[in-house]
């Protein structure tokens, strides 16, 4: 073996062992072998590549393995080690080194070494290795299980809203709630239409054949895939049948037999790629691989066949269940090209991880790492370049052909070479199958219908366009007949008469013989892995996530320590006495505060659980594990942290405050605090499971706390709770915790050995008197009753959480919408099929008609790229010269010379031994972009395309930039550059609640100046310009459609791309950067977007686009190409030429570069011939070659020319930084905020509903309490009610505003970077927008509470109650906004905000009256906003009442005297309280504005 390696064959694609011939070499070993020769002398003969000594060594090892018991034999394999071979070679030994290994304990190094040797070039070595696996199986005559999926007369229908009724306004949402409530009792008001998604389709997906699913948008591809995988939403109506090997879906477990790979990537962001795949592999198990291996080994032993070591090791290693990290994972990582990022976290919105294309591959790998052989794959190539897509599909094709798997895959823009990998094609359009059968006959079918695919047109692109009414005519090829539109239904009928259709019909007419189905083909058990293994995997994953989220737990503990220290010093034992009832009530306040802090401590579980739910729901639907397997580790692994936090709290507070000194009472309180924490964690987990959405869960959690808090027995004693609410007292967990804590404390000797006189003058033990006065149970057994109650609630909440995970589905599914016009047309012609785009609907009716056709520039006829004319023909029936646009602009060029970009070296790379301080991402990039020239910026993933664009556009927020950048010869100044440039980001970031036209008007009004040259730019001219831009980008018929959230409501992906372009165009820029404008689009949508781009260029603007996997049409629509290689180096910069000829000539001139094949996509060919593997093969560096070329010298000359200003020109200059004045910016921002708030029911309706519920709850619980002022306890109850209402409504306002501000802040970063406005007008507009909504909220809250509690109806008192409540709600809302502004996201903001809730509570004056707060903490009382609120509410209502009340242990007093001396509230202080409340609101709003201006958490 070592001779092979030493002879220069290191580039050989794998290492294999031959089976049969004497003295095989490496190349011969990879040759395909006949699969029929089972056993015989041929199988027994062995030869070594290193001679007989090697063969003898291997034979001895194998003989030793054969003597082992069956179980051990299945776990033991022979491994040849490269390191040991090298050592032997150095020592002069002439034989190969082997060792026996336990495949369950293969080390990381051993696995990696094996993969490196066997799969050096993934797609090529994969085929060879799989061929050897297959040969081994065939040699002993084992038949692999196969699955044929058939569907007959499959029909799927949905019910959906019509027209504007679907828009998410406050009014529509209220109607939806009302209709849902009526629907529960059988009444179904409202207009809904039936949408037929699939119309009686029939077909078959066969094993060993790769099947491609094609179709235009909304044709039903995803629905078909879901239906075949048995994963259709239960709310959909389904007809027809789907069978696997003749078995219907109900007869076996479809989720285990087949896997649906979604087009959305849902993963745990904190886990690495390898950990994600390992967990998936452990949950899916190995299926029947072990049984197959056992039978294989038995037959080989009988036949005397000795398998190849590598093949044997691989099969054994991938057949072992319960391995933490499997060789199957390493294999999957390699064939998907994920091995380079295996140890990188996947990432999410909170943390940077792998790229979007890599995430897409992880989604695929998560399923193929398991034993499932039936795969339904939905658009798995989004975000991938064409060469990566080709590699992945090629590997999957090999698995299908050699492993007899069944795969149906939909792709958006498959390149011709990828298309050629498929055996069968299913073409779906308008819910009907137009063609299904061999790929070779698909063009023949359409030619029989009169349509022909053009020469330089990809077949897949042709197939997706030929059924479209807009695009069909250009493909008409029958010159003997005039063109007429052929409908989808007619195509479908013609296919049934086509020879392929007839064969399919014959195939389906013969039922599948169930007896032919392999017993291992289908899975009949929901659980394929043992419970023990699932628990091990789940515990390991949960522990890993806890370690990765350790910051949260450390932060929580530190926060708890701080609050404990504050509480200890507030209730310091030197200030705490046990003399009378007043002293006792202070202790009750300390116990109550302890209870509430530890209850609130569980709030973090809410957001942590919500973020995990999407991944859980995905795993649940795939039957990875039952729900309790997810919840058990979740609960158990939190217990140690809860114990630590409980110990910390009790140790810090117990003796410092001065609770009962007995040791047993210390440990009893510790137990109770622990149980309270466990109960709180269970409560918030259950809330998260029931609500399933962050905003709703925040409100639901606050609602649960409110009910438990109010009915816990401490705000309102049991005797005072109305009988209609008494049930709430018994189901409040806080009641059990409160009573248990109090009994534990007040039964101590220091309370029981002292006596006080009751109202009748009879002596009573102080502890008993205290408990009776506070309505606490006086039975000492209540400690254990309370502890048992808390334990019971803990178990109940966790069971409820588990049940919610079992039975509830995730929220926020896309809602199909039918426009008014489409519905009327369907009613008129009786067509049940409606064309649907999720949520793309006009607010005043239908807008689903295709976009109006565009005038084309006369410049097109002279274009050098013939791809342009074909591109423009898509969807266009008219053409003519474009008139000039209403606003002039100055064409500008951009040149850049030797641009370098560095970032600080990542810590992970430094840990791996990298010594440099900086990582270089761009290296000596030189080039230019010119007016009326469309430039493509290309390169493989990670080449630095977006990085270069960000650097040139000035969008980088970090790193180090070097080089010379000039605009028309003058040095680039970012402030002025932002005014004349536009940047279309890949992610299409827009405010979701405004319409298309409103988005454009908003951008135009902020970015267009008052004057261009001598021309005044009036508002009417701006509106006219907006209309022209909408026409240019074909959005005029979508002008009244809501933008919406991607994938949920609003515009389709392609429409959002065009909106992104339009938003930049209305700024009238001279230079436009576009990042991936066609990513995630099908061929037709990409063509529409590119036509928009081309139209933009033809107005004379400078446009640059990064692009991933262009079709031939799209690629040749560009004029020039700037190509980067990995490392950010230029390898080509120049013209494409007609049919890309100039670019092709450049690369073909390089020695060793293969010629382009006929009809091959030039973009794909270019990426392939310039890849890293090609550089290794040619032993050259393309970047160095380019730098020595004539092309480079020409570009240098051009850059030097463009770096000199033309005579008579001047540098860009604007008198102000922004186009609009500060007032103008504020007006525009306020206008958009108004629209956003009105159309945000999930925010405003939720908080309004919560406020209404709180008001009614408090009103019914504290019914007419204002008239029952007989004693001090009644007054304390009223104060408690007021404090509770303001605190909970305030906290809910704070929590619900955070996600809204966070979403809008993302848009703000884009708009501010574009130079639309400064931060202050934006922030002030958002602050002002809250005022009317909070006013409405306060108005109905005040009326309800004031009336039901029967406070005194005087104008002054009512006004003061309203005033204090209004500004309290307002400052809480602004406090929430401020916490977002100082945090990277709303999850961190929620934790930060919660940290101060406890302090607000403690110093509110409710738990400990102001006169009793130690002097060293009194300063914080005056800084606590909640304290001023309670002060204002109490003193305005009761500060002037002279009614006599009884006070326990003291003489009777007036209410005003008691309020002044017990609580420290002075009536004369009211003129100070009012402005202070206003100041708190102003302060938080001001801090929000300052932080949003100064802090930037966007890392680019």
Curated annotation (Swiss-Prot):
Similarity section: Belongs to the ABC transporter superfamily. ABCG family. PDR (TC 3.A.1.205) subfamily.
Biased composition regions of type Polar residues, renumbered to the chain: 837-846
Membrane topology of the entry: Multi-pass membrane protein
Lineage top rank: taxon: Eukaryota
Protein name: ABC transporter G family member 42
Species, as recorded: Oryza sativa subsp. japonica (Rice)
Gene name in the database record: ABCG42
Domain ABC transmembrane type-2 intervals: 533-746, 1224-1438
ABC transporter domain mapped to chain residues: 182-455, 894-1151
GO terms assigned for molecular function: ABC-type transporter activity; ATP binding; ATP hydrolysis activity
Compartments where located: Membrane
Transmembrane segments: 551-571, 584-604, 639-659, 670-690, 695-715, 724-744, 783-803, 1245-1265, 1277-1297, 1331-1351, 1358-1378, 1388-1408, 1416-1436, 1472-1492
Biased composition (Basic and acidic residues): 822-834
Keyword vocabulary terms for this entry: ATP-binding, Membrane, Nucleotide-binding, Repeat, Transmembrane, Transmembrane helix, Transport
Function text: May be a general defense protein.
Major place of residence: membrane
């Amino acid at each position: 073996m070592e001779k092979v390696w030493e002879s220069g064959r290191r580039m050989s694609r794998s290492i294999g062992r031959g089976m049969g011939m004497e003295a095989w070499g490496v190349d011969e070993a990879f040759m395909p072998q006949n699969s029929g020769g089972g056993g015989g002398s041929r199988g027994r003969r062995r030869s070594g590549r290193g001679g007989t000594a090697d063969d003898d060594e291997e034979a001895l090892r194998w003989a030793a393995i054969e003597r082992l018991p069956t179980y051990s034999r299945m776990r033991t394999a022979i491994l040849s080690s490269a390191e040991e071979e090298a050592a032997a070679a150095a020592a002069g030994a002439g034989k190969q080194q082997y060792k026996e290994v336990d495949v369950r304990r293969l080390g990381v190094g051993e696995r990696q070494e094996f993969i490196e040797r066997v799969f050096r070039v993934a797609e090529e070595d994969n085929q060879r290795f799989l061929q050897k696996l297959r040969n081994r199986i065939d040699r002993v005559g084992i038949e692999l299980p196969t699955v044929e999926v058939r569907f007959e007369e499959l029909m799927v229908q949905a019910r959906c809203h019509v027209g504007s009724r679907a828009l998410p306004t406050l009014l529509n949402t209220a109607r939806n709630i009302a209709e849902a409530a009526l629907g529960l009792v059988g009444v179904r008001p409202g207009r809904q239409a039936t949408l037929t998604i699939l119309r009686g389709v029939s077909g078959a997906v066969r094993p060993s054949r790769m099947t491609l699913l094609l179709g235009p948008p909304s044709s039903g591809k995803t629905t078909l895939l879901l239906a075949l995988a048995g994963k259709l939403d239960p709310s959909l109506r389904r007809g027809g049948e789907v069978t696997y090997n003749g078995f219907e879906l109900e007869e076996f477990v479809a989720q285990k037999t087949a896997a649906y790979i979604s087009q959305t990537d849902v993963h745990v962001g904190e886990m690495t790629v390898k950990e994600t795949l390992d967990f998936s592999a452990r949950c899916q198990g190995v299926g029947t691989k072990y049984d197959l291996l056992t039978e294989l080994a038995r037959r080989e032993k009988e036949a005397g066949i000795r398998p190849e070591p590598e093949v044997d090791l691989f099969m054994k290693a991938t057949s072992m269940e319960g391995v933490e990290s499997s060789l199957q994972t390493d294999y999957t990582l390699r064939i998907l090209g994920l091995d380079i990022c295996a140890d990188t976290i996947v990432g999410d919105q909170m943390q940077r991880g792998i790229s979007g294309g890599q995430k897409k591959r992880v989604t695929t790998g998560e399923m193929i790492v398991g034993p499932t052989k039936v795969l339904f794959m939905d658009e798995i190539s989004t975000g991938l370049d064409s060469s990566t897509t080709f590699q992945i599909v090629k590997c999957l094709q090999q698995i299908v052909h050699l492993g007899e798997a069944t795969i149906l895959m939909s792709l958006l823009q498959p390149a011709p070479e990828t298309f050629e990998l498929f055996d069968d094609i299913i073409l779906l359009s308008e819910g009907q199958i137009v063609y299904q059968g061999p790929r070779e006959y698909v063009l023949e079918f359409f030619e029989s219908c009169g349509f022909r695919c053009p020469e330089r047109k990809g077949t897949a692109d042709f197939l997706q366009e030929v059924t479209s009414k807009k695009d069909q005519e250009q493909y008409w090829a029958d010159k003997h007949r005039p063109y007429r539109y052929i409908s989808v239904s007619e195509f479908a009928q013609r296919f049934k008469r086509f020879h392929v259709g007839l064969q399919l019909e014959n195939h389906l007419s013969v039922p599948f013989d169930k007896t032919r189905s392999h017993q291992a083909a289908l899975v009949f058990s929901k659980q394929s892995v043992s419970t023990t293994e699932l628990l091990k995997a789940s515990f390991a994953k949960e522990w890993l996530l806890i370690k990765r989220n350790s910051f949260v737990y450390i932060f929580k503990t530190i926060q708890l320590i701080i609050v404990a220290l504050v509480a200890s010093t507030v209730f310091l034992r030197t200030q705490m006495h046990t003399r009378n009832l007043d002293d006792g009530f202070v202790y009750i306040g300390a116990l109550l505060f302890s209870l509430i802090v530890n209850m609130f401590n569980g709030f973090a579980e809410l957001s942590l659980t919500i973020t995990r739910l999407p991944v859980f729901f995905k795993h649940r639907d795939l039957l990875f594990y039952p729900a309790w397997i997810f919840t058990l580790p979740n609960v158990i692994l939190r217990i140690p942290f809860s114990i630590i936090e409980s110990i910390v709290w009790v140790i810090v507070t117990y003796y410092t405050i001065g609770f009962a000194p007995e040791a047993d009472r210390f440990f009893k309180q510790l137990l109770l605090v622990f149980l309270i924490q466990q109960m709180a964690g269970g409560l918030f987990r259950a809330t998260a499971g029931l609500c399933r959405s962050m905003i709703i869960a925040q409100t639901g959690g606050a609602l649960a706390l409110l009910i438990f808090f109010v009915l816990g027995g401490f705000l309102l004693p049991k005797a005072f709770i109305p009988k209609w609410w008494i049930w709430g007292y018994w189901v409040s967990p806080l009641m059990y915790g409160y009573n248990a804590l109090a009994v534990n404390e007040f039964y101590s000797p220091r309370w029981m050995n002292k006596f006080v006189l009751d109202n009748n003058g009879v002596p009573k033990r102080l502890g008993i008197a205290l408990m009776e006065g506070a309505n606490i149970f006086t039975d000492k057994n209540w400690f254990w009753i309370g502890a048992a109650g808390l334990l019971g609630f803990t178990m109940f909440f966790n069971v409820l959480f588990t049940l919610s995970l079992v039975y509830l589905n995730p929220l926020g599914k896309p809602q199909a919408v039918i426009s008014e016009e489409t519905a009327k047309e369907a009613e008129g012609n009786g067509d049940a099929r409606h064309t649907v785009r999720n949520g793309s609907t006009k607010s005043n009716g239908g807008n689903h008609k295709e976009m109006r056709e565009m005038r084309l520039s006369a410049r097109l006829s002279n274009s050098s790229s013939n791809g342009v004319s074909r591109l423009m023909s898509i969807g266009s029936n008219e053409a003519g010269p474009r008139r000039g646009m209403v606003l002039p602009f100055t064409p500008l060029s951009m040149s850049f010379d030797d641009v370098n970009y560095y970032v600080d070296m990542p810590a992970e790379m430094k840990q791996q031994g990298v010594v440099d301080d900086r990582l270089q991402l761009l290296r000596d990039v030189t080039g230019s972009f010119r007016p009326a020239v469309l430039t493509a910026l290309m390169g493989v993933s990670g080449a630095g395309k977006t990085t270069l664009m960000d650097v040139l556009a000035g969008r980088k927020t970090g790193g180090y930039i070097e080089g010379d950048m000039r605009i028309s010869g003058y040095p680039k100044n970012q402030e002025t550059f932002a005014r004349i440039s536009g940047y279309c980001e890949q992610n299409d970031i827009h405010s979701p609640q405004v319409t298309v036209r409103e988005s454009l008007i908003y951008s135009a009004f902020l970015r267009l100046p008052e004057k261009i040259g001598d021309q005044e730019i009036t508002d009417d001219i701006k509106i006219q310009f907006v209309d022209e831009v909408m026409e240019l980008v074909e959005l005029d018929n979508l002008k009244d459609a809501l933008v919406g959230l991607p994938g949920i409501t609003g515009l389709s992906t392609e429409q959002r791309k065009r909106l992104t372009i339009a938003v930049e165009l209305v700024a009238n820029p001279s230079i436009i950067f576009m990042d991936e404008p066609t990513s995630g689009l099908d061929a037709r949508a990409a063509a529409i977007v590119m036509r928009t781009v081309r139209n933009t260029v033809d107005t004379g603007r400078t446009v640059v686009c990064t692009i991933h996997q262009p079709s031939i049409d799209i690629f040749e629509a560009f004029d020039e190409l700037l190509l980067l290689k990995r490392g950010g180096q230029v390898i080509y910069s120049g013209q494409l030429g007609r049919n890309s000829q100039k670019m092709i000539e450049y690369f073909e001139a390089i020695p060793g570069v293969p010629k382009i094949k006929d009809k091959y996509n030039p973009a794909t060919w270019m990426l392939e011939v310039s890849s890293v593997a090609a550089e290794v093969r040619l032993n050259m560096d393309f970047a160095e070659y380019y730098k020595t070329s004539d092309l480079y010298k020409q570009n240098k000359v051009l850059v030097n020319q463009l770096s000199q200003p033309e005579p008579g020109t001047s540098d860009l200059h604007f008198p102000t930084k922004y186009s609009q004045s500060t007032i103008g910016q504020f007006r525009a921002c306020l206008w958009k905020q108004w629209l956003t708030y009105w159309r945000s029911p999930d925010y405003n309706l939720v908080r309004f509903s919560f406020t209404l519920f709180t008001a009614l709850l408090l009103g019914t619980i504290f019914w007419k309490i204002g008239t029952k002022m007989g004693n001090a306890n009644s007054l304390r109850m009223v104060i408690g009610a007021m404090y509770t209402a303001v605190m909970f409504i305030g906290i809910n306002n704070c929590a619900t505003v955070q996600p809204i501000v966070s979403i809008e802040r993302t848009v703000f970063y884009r708009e501010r970077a574009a130079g639309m406005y400064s931060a202050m007008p934006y922030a002030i507009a958002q602050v002002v927008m809250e005022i009317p909504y909070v006013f409405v909220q306060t108005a109905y809250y005040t009326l309800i509470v004031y009336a039901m509690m029967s406070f005194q109806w005087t104008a002054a008192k009512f006004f003061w109650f309203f005033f204090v409540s209004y500004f309290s709600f307002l400052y809480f809302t602004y406090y929430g906004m401020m916490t977002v502004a100082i945090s990277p996201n709303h999850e961190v903001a929620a934790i930060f905000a919660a940290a101060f809730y406890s302090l607000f509570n403690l110093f509110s004056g409710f738990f400990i009256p102001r006169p009793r707060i130690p002097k060293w903490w009194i300063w914080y009382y005056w800084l606590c906003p909640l304290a001023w609120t309670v002060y204002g509410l109490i003193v305005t209502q009761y500060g002037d009442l002279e009614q006599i009340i009884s006070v326990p242990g003291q003489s009777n007093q007036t209410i005003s005297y008691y309020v002044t001396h017990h609580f420290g509230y002075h009536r004369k202080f009211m003129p100070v309280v009012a402005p202070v409340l206003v100041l708190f609101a102003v302060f938080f709003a001001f801090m929000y504005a300052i932080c949003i201006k100064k802090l930037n958490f966007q890392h680019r």
